């Protein structure tokens, strides 16, 4: 695995609402750890989008090749810069469903196009299918830094307002994952008559 450069990590995994100057394009990076249930690391890697192929699809291909032994259980932790798009969410759900010996957890730095219904549905589908999607906070950023960044033995230095941004994104994700029935009941409970 080629570790990420510090500047790439901070730019791409940064959870700020707006890109700080100098402006740059945010890309999708997916860093994962494949472990045995007792914690033994089998493999780790960092992937990114390739031409017309999302990082999640590259991830599925890699994991398929690494987990052919269906008698062995595997746990996978993913750190991703953007939450999966609806297509990738669907593919991840199908992949985990077809491979019950795998357990997948996703930590996203930011939510991708979270205001669009289709993207929200993708996140809900992951959640409903038993694939937890959570927002990265300081412990996840630190773990990602330790395991995937060429940090030259430097500790992770959080950018300003990292915690505040994480909490804001978590609230948004929580609202997306709240079942619509609960929202309807909450609306009825307002008794706006």
From Swiss-Prot:
Zn(2+) binds at residues 54, 85, 88. Signal peptide: none annotated. It is an enzyme of class 3 (hydrolase). It is found in: Cytoplasm. Its EC number is 3.5.4.38. The active site is at residue 56. Expressed in peripheral blood mononuclear cells. InterPro entries: APOBEC/CMP_deaminase_Zn-bd, APOBEC_Cyt_Deaminase, CMP_dCMP_dom, Cytidine_deaminase-like. It catalyses: a 2'-deoxycytidine in single-stranded DNA + H2O + H(+) = a 2'-deoxyuridine in single-stranded DNA + NH4(+). Changing residue 94 to T: In allele A3Z3; haplotype 3. One of its GO terms (molecular function) is cytidine deaminase activity. Keywords: Cytoplasm, Hydrolase, Metal-binding, Zinc. The keyword Cytoplasm applies. GO terms for biological process: cytidine to uridine editing; defense response to virus; DNA cytosine deamination; negative regulation of single stranded viral RNA replication via double stranded DNA intermediate. Residues 24-126 form the CMP/dCMP-type deaminase domain. Changing residue 68 to Q: In allele A3Z3; haplotype 3 and 7. GO terms for cellular component: cytoplasm; nucleus; P-body. Changing residue 56 to A: Probable loss of catalytic activity. Fails to suppress FIV infectivity. Its cofactor is Zn(2+). Homodimer. DNA deaminase (cytidine deaminase) which acts as an inhibitor of retrovirus replication and retrotransposon mobility via deaminase-dependent and -independent mechanisms. Selectively targets single-stranded DNA and does not deaminate double-stranded DNA or single- or double-stranded RNA. Exhibits single-stranded DNA deaminase activity (in vitro). Incorporates into the released virions of the virion infectivity factor (vif)-deficient feline immunodeficiency virus (FIV) and suppresses FIV infectivity, probably in a deaminase-dependent manner (in vitro). Belongs to the cytidine and deoxycytidylate deaminase family. This is DNA dC->dU-editing enzyme APOBEC-3H. It comes from Felis catus (Cat). The lineage of its organism: Eukaryota, Metazoa, Chordata, Craniata, Vertebrata. The gene is APOBEC3H.
């Amino acid at each position: 695995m080629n570790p990420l450069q510090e500047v790439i990590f901070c730019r791409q995994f940064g959870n700020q609402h707006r890109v700080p100057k100098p402006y740059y394009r945010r890309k999708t990076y997916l860093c994962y750890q494949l472990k045995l249930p007792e914690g033994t690391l089998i493999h780790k890697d960092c992937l990114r989008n390739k031409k017309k192929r999302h990082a999640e699809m590259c991830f599925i291909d890699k994991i398929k090749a690494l987990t052919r032994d269906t008698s062995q259980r595997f746990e996978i932790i993913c750190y991703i810069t953007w939450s999966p798009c609806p297509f990738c969410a669907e593919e991840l759900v199908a992949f985990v469903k077809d491979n019950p010996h795998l357990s997948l957890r996703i930590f996203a730095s930011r939510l991708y196009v979270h205001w669009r219904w289709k993207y929200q549905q993708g996140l809900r589908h992951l959640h409903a299918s038993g694939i937890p999607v959570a927002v990265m906070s300081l412990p996840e950023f630190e773990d990602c830094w330790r395991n995937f960044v060429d940090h030259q033995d430097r500790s992770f230095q959080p950018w300003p307002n990292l915690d505040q941004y994480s909490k804001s994104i978590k609230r948004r994700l929580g609202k997306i994952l709240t079942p619509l029935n609960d929202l309807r009941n909450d609306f009825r409970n307002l008794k706006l008559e």
